[in-house]
Amino acid sequence: MLRIADKTFDSHLFTGTGKFASAQLMVDAIRASGSQLVTLAMKRVDLRKPNDAILSPLLEAGVTLLPNTSGAKTAEEAIFAAQLAREALGTHWLKLEIHPDARWLLPDPIETLKAAGELVKQGFVVLPYCGADPVLCKRLEEVGCAAVMPLGAPIGSNQGLETRAMLEIIIQQATVPVVVDAGIGVPSHATQALEMGADAVLVNTAIAVANDPVMMANAFRLAVEAGVLARQAVPGNRSVYASATSPLTGFLEVSA
């Protein structure tokens, strides 16, 4: 069970809604993933249409929506987008994203911290997408963010946990949930994140661009479950030395 602010989730896998070939495929994949929290870019939704092709299926699926501010380049733009999302969707939950460079899509730490503090004051449950910077994550926690979402690698890159060393520090010092966001390309990456102590992962591109998104979503569901179970089982310590699993000399003594 995962708790963030005032909500609890059975699944430790969060999913996105971008890059799917169709709205139906998106919904089918989300259902196969078992995800209960789904991010939604406000710039992709036509709020003037009561039956928006993306929003309506998600509402019918019964998932918790996490609108994001993707596309915002400054704190001011992100705050404005957040206010629109709250008014339109009736939710105070928000994934804060501020990335001014469209080529790399790396989060702006200064603008993110600035916006996070203000949005918390305005009553939002803020989950900020941020770099894998332990100092920044602690500062975001201190201004009242309900969780932190450090990247594993650049958005959509499928590179995996390139920031592993920093993620381990963030997880060790955090007192709020840590959600590894961005860069997760295959199910084994998700397993590794959960094994190291992350509370959840957010996956979009790896599922959406797969030849079979529904099958890949199911694979990620199983991978996340495996990671959670492995962590709960408490793995043995690593060692540079070998450790025999069977007696090395007993049979010689019997023969003698």
From Swiss-Prot:
GO terms for biological process: thiamine diphosphate biosynthetic process. Homotetramer. Forms heterodimers with either ThiH or ThiS. Belongs to the ThiG family. One of its GO terms (molecular function) is thiazole synthase activity. Pfam families: ThiG. It catalyses: [ThiS sulfur-carrier protein]-C-terminal-Gly-aminoethanethioate + 2-iminoacetate + 1-deoxy-D-xylulose 5-phosphate = [ThiS sulfur-carrier protein]-C-terminal Gly-Gly + 2-[(2R,5Z)-2-carboxy-4-methylthiazol-5(2H)-ylidene]ethyl phosphate + 2 H2O + H(+). GO terms for cellular component: cytoplasm. It comes from the Bacteria. Keywords: Cytoplasm, Schiff base, Thiamine biosynthesis, Transferase. 1-deoxy-D-xylulose 5-phosphate binds at residues 156, 182-183, 204-205. InterPro entries: Aldolase_TIM (IPR013785), Thiazole_synthase_ThiG (IPR033983), ThiG (IPR008867). Catalyzes the rearrangement of 1-deoxy-D-xylulose 5-phosphate (DXP) to produce the thiazole phosphate moiety of thiamine. Sulfur is provided by the thiocarboxylate moiety of the carrier protein ThiS. In vitro, sulfur can be provided by H(2)S. It comes from Salmonella arizonae (strain ATCC BAA-731 / CDC346-86 / RSK2980). Pathway: Cofactor biosynthesis; thiamine diphosphate biosynthesis. It is found in: Cytoplasm. The active site is at 95 (schiff-base intermediate with dxp). This is Thiazole synthase. Its EC number is 2.8.1.10. Coiled coil: none annotated.
